[in-house]
């Protein structure tokens, strides 16, 4: 199966203002990240707040420029595209944002919000555009009268459906969904997740699904990448990640998921706070919180390595992770 997205050694650093004679410092929000997404696949990207996952999503769709590395969408390197070439490429990839209200123009009716990208990219009669917008509203489970309403007239879940319809307007092949259900009540989260799965099949979509909640990611993803302090520390199929985690951070995340059928006495409690990306620890970025860290981890940075079954992990002692309680 062909890759729709290839992310190669992407870095995104932000300069920190320092004194005139001081050495330039950087916040390493994304640090040497590589992965790929196949056509029709959902890649779930999970990690704590501040790990760099949302920044990575913005870099991938060119809302932010990468410091280095390359992003290839449908075989085209979009990393340094500018002007008309960048504008043309944007039809292939769109984003669903975390806060549907903040991402929708309160001064526009829903019909105008969804039709705006179509007007910007396609020369179609107004009647055809309206017909297309009404079709998209139907696809996301909204009635035709939504066309003439404003965003504030809808619930959070309905506003997110409007955002999804807008993302579909140009028929992209790749959608980056940045925490698309985190602002919704639990009762509505599953509805939106099921909608995304239905739309994926209907429109032949691929997703980069970003979330901090592993249980949400499990519901929708084919492959899961676990991110920590700017690095991806593990990649595997959803089943492999949950049944055979090989990174201690992944193991800790899984142990924190509430279990209905058992008491969660084996939860792995990570000590300490997430280090600052402006001052990351030397060696493995996780060693300051890792229950199995050794001296080697304090001095060397583990690289993602293939351990079979399309399972990759960045850990020197992955064979000891199974001994952890959780």
Name what the model sees in each region.
Residues 21-24, 78-94, 120, 240-245, ...:
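ABC ATPase NBD coupling module
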Residues 169-173:
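A short, proline-enriched helix->beta-strand linker immediately N-terminal to the Walker B motif
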Residues 77, 127-145, 254, 258:
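Conserved ABC ATPase "signature" region
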Residues 2-3, 17-21, 237-326:
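Short catalytic/signature loops enriched in Gly
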Residues 176, 180, 184, 188-265:
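P-loop NTP-binding/switch modules centered on Walker-like glycine-rich loops
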Residues 150-154, 158:
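Conserved ABC ATPase signature
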Residues 69-77:
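Conserved ABC transporter NBD signature motif
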């Amino acid at each position: 199966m062909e890759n729709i997205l290839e992310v190669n050694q992407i870095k995104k650093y932000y300069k920190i203002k320092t004194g005139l004679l001081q050495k330039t410092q950087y916040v390493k929000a994304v640090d040497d990240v590589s992965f790929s997404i196949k056509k029709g696949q959902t890649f779930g990207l999970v990690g704590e707040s501040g790990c760099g996952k949302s920044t990575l999503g913005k870099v991938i769709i060119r809302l932010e420029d990468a410091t280095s590395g390359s992003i290839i969408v449908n075989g085209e390197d979009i990393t340094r595209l500018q002007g008309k070439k960048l504008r043309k490429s944007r039809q292939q990839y769109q984003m669903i944002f975390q806060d549907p209200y903040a991402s929708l123009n309160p001064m526009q009716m829903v019909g105008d919000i969804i039709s705006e990208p179509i007007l910007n990219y396609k020369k179609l009669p107004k009647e055809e555009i309206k017909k297309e917008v009404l079709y998209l509203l139907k696809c996301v489970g909204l009635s035709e009268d939504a066309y003439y309403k404003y965003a504030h007239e809808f619930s959070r879940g309905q506003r997110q459906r409007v955002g999804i319809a807008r993302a579909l307007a140009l028929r992209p092949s790749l959608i980056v969904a940045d925490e698309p259900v985190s602002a919704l009540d639990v009762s509505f989260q599953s509805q939106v997740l099921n909608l995304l799965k239905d739309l994926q099949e209907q429109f032949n979509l691929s997703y980069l699904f970003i979330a901090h909640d592993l249980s949400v990611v499990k519901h929708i993803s084919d492959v899961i990448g676990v991110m920590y302090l700017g690095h991806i520390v593990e990649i595997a199929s959803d089943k492999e990640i949950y049944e055979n985690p090989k990174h201690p951070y992944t193991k800790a995340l899984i142990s924190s998921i509430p279990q209905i059928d058992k008491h969660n006495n084996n939860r792995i409690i990570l000590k300490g706070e997430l280090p600052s990306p402006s001052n990351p620890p030397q060696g493995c970025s996780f060693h300051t919180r890792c229950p199995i860290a050794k001296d080697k981890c304090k001095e060397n940075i583990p690289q993602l390595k293939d351990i079979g079954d399309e399972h990759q992990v960045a850990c020197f002692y992955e064979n000891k992770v199974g001994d952890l309680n959780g």
